[in-house]
Design a protein with these regions (language model features):
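Transmembrane helix-loop boundary segments of multi-pass membrane transporters
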Residues: 39-40, 58, 105-117, 134-150, ...
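Intrinsically disordered, low-complexity non-transmembrane regions of multi-pass membrane transporters
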Residues: 1-12, 16, 67-81, 195-206, ...
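Hydrophobic core segments of alpha-helical transmembrane domains in multi-pass membrane transport
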Residues: 17-30, 44-54, 86-93, 123-134, ...
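Alpha-helical transmembrane segments and their helix-start/interface "positive-inside/aromatic belt" motifs
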Residues: 9-15, 39-45, 73-82, 141-146, ...
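Helix-loop-helix junctions within the multi-pass membrane cores of secondary transporters/permeases
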Residues: 72-73, 80-151, 329-410
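Juxtamembrane and boundary regions of transmembrane helices in multi-pass small-molecule transporters
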Residues: 131-146, 162, 194-239, 386-401, ...
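Transmembrane helix-loop junctions in multi-pass membrane proteins
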Residues: 25-39, 59-67, 93-108, 127-138, ...
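Transmembrane helical segments that form the transport core of multi-pass membrane transport proteins
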Residues: 237-349
Length: 505
């Protein structure tokens, strides 16, 4: 166990170290910082590294087997109303627990937190149920996505313009470290228990559909709720001068994030307890292992969220402000490329996705290749976001052509890549995006006198869009190179079914 934890921490070190070095270089060149603020950032980086290590191991031990077990049992029960109700409730409950959603709700000042949170949760619940029905009835993911995105853009034209960016960002932040491991595992369990040659390809796509639900529901909220404006609350930067101030900032925030994470995990643990009472699905040894996994997950999330919110968010705002106020505003674009390329590696849910992709494709799509594809995509997204900050161009000029390209590609790549790509979009836009990239864009927009709501907000949506294109282009290259992945998908689906059935005996 200790060896596995050390391995996960080493992996997280390699993920967080590049972005830490980038900020250090900027702090001694273009954007000088006070020593206290820099110390806050470095302490946050340490917490990120350790927290990611604990979280990845914990999710592997607890969330993944729970999701697979629930998904498999739902299919075997063959009761459609039960499947729909259970999936809706699970989607809504886990979304309410998502830390990223709490961050978003706090930033949208004009909508009461509970209204926004419950609206988004209902959206995820509805679309998780729809995603499960898609797997069971073998509906084409690419066709379903095309229909839903057309409806989405039609709906967006009837919603107030202030809500467009808010809505698209809501789709990105709701699929974070809490929801991704569980929802992906449910998909694996469902498709494995389906026992057919296309099961493995259909194990992806749940996160993609769950990301659409919040966008649609927030757009509807904008139409019917009629708030006066969707203003965001800026990041508050507390003066930090001495090392005592640094320690105090973390000590003060630690209980809040501990409470937040424990409240977030309680519904998931409740699902395990109820599921075990009703089905007796897990042996005693498995339950002990899963319990330890939940403890690791809680520790990891507390450390990660404390580090990223206390250490990273203020620095992101300072970097954006400093670069925009300098005589070299255009440096926001090349620096955005570098930050975007490396920051996605520090998203905890990304590593969970990459591991599951590598496992399910038998190594044909490795973690390294997935990391490169996601990094290139997010780098492009941050560049577009910085261009929007500097020029004020409408988000529609980016997202509409982007989704047209992504949906067009979905008809020319192996089916497994479509699911992976659209899932990657939701996964890439996690807490690092909402607590570092968003403050970066907001700081820059404020410094140049732009409209923060329409110009800076939307960066999460662009980060969620970019992997859709990047990963599918990777799929095109794979198909032209050897055609290995589609064949592998058929072989793997049988292997997964055998392993799943053996566990149940």
């Amino acid at each position: 166990m200790n060896e596995k934890l050390e391995e996960k921490i080493r992996e997280s070190l390699s993920s967080v170290l590049p972005i830490t070095i980038i900020v250090l270089v900027l702090s001694i060149t273009l954007v000088p910082m006070e020593i206290g603020t820099l110390a806050l950032f470095l302490a946050g980086a340490v917490l990120l590294i350790v927290g990611m290590g604990f979280f990845q191991l914990g999710a592997e031990m607890s969330m993944t087997p729970l999701g697979q077990g629930v998904g498999g049992r739902l299919v075997k029960g063959k009761r459609l109303p039960v499947i729909v109700v259970v999936c809706f409730l699970m989607g809504a409950i886990i979304t309410i627990s998502e830390p990223d959603l709490q961050v978003l709700a706090n930033q949208v000042a004009s909508i009461p937190n509970n209204v926004l949170i419950w609206t988004v949760a209902v959206g995820v619940g509805i679309f998780l149920a729809a995603a499960v029905l898609r797997i069971l009835f073998r509906v084409s993911l690419s066709r379903l996505l095309m229909v839903l995105y057309i409806l989405l853009f039609i709906l967006s034209f009837f919603s107030p313009s202030e809500f467009t960016s808010v809505a698209f960002d809501a789709g990105g932040v709701t699929t974070g470290p809490m929801t991704v491991p569980f929802i992906m595992a449910v998909g694996i369990g469902l498709s494995a228990a389906r026992s057919d040659k296309e099961g493995e390809g259909d194990s992806f796509g749940l996160i993609a559909l769950c990301s659409i639900g919040p966008i649609m529901m927030v757009l509807l909220l904008g139409i019917f709720y009629h708030p006066t404006e969707a203003v965001y609350t800026a990041v508050e930067i507390t003066p930090v001068i001495t090392t005592r101030d640094v320690v105090y900032q973390f000590v003060e925030a630690f209980p809040d994030y501990t409470k937040e994470v424990i409240y977030s995990m309680l519904p998931v643990i409740g699902v395990l307890v109820v599921f075990q009472i009703l089905t007796g699905n897990y042996r005693k040894r498995q339950l002990i292992r899963m319990s330890i996994g939940f403890v690791y997950t809680i520790i990891g999330l507390i450390l990660f969220l404390t580090g990223v919110n206390v250490g990273f968010a203020p620095v992101g705002n300072l970097l954006g402000t400093g670069l925009a106020e300098s005589t070299f505003q255009w440096l926001l674009v090349p620096i955005g490329i570098v930050i975007g390329y490396y920051i996605v590696k520090a998203e905890p849910a990304v590593q969970v996705l990459n591991e599951q992709v590598e496992d399910l494709t038998g190594g044909a799509v490795s973690r390294r290749i997935m990391n490169v594809a996601l990094s290139v995509g997010v780098a492009g997204a941050v560049v577009l976001a910085m261009v929007r900050v500097l020029t004020g161009i409408n988000i529609y000029w980016v997202v509409i052509p982007g989704y047209i390209i992504a949906l067009a590609l979905s008809h020319f790549v192996p089916k497994v890549f479509v699911g992976i790509a659209f899932d990657s979009g939701g996964v890439a836009s996690g807490p690092m995006t909402s607590t570092f990239l968003l403050p970066l864009a907001m700081g820059a927009s404020t410094a140049i006198g732009g409209n923060v709501v329409t110009d800076a907000f939307g960066i999460v949506a662009l980060v969620a869009l970019a992997p859709l294109i990047a990963v599918q282009l990777m799929g095109v290259m794979y198909e032209h190179r050897s055609g290995t992945v589609p064949q592998l998908a058929e072989e793997l689906s049988d292997d997964i079914v055998v392993e799943f059935e053996e566990e149940k005996e």
